Amino acid sequence: VHAVCPGDGEIGVFNRSHYEEVLVVRAKGLVPESVWKKRYRHVNEFERMLSDEGTKIIKCLLNVSKAEQARRFQDRLDDPTKNWKFRAGDLADRKLWPKFQDAYDDMVRNTSTSYAPWHVVPSDHNWVRNLAVAKLLLNALKEMNPKFPPPEPGIEGTKIA
């Protein structure tokens, strides 16, 4: 994740990223508790470093109910234009719903900090999710008050022929 973090003046969006290392590996039992549990500290230290260096971190947990997940999965199976979104492993993962929910709860509890808090966003309705996330981003940008960088020296007044 570190290699693809946004630089000064850039915005980056990550889908899951390093959180897979405390969610999937835990819910599926891929590594022992002693391994995934210490990763909370690793995540917090990494995000602390980013924050200390001036990165604004906005974390959104897009919370979809089990019933809505079932509806979306069925829609992906029934609609040929959405088949590409479905994979057989989704059904196996769905059977682990309680384990994933426990992992999500612990992840939020252990990695929500003053410098990188979690925002749990109700996401059964896309418009609600989109509005909530847009407001979070808009408020963050207003607070940051970004400015365009100055032009490169010597280009002022240049005319393209």
Can you name each region flagged by the protein language model?
Residues 1-3, 75, 134-135:
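Short, surface-exposed amphipathic charged segments that create phosphate/polyanion-binding patches used
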Residues 1-44:
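Conserved nucleotide-sensing/catalytic segment adjacent to the nucleotide-binding pocket
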Residues 8-11, 54-58, 117:
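Loop/turn-to-beta-strand initiation segments
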Residues 13, 60, 121:
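Conserved RecA-like P-loop NTPase ATPase core
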Residues 18-20, 64-67, 125-127:
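Short, solvent-exposed loop/turn segments at secondary-structure junctions
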Residues 24-42, 50-102, 149-156:
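A glycine- and Lys/Arg-enriched "phosphate-lid" helix/loop adjacent to the NTP-binding pocket
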Residues 49-53, 110-113:
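Arginine/glycine-rich "motif VI" loop of SF2 helicases in the C-terminal RecA-like domain
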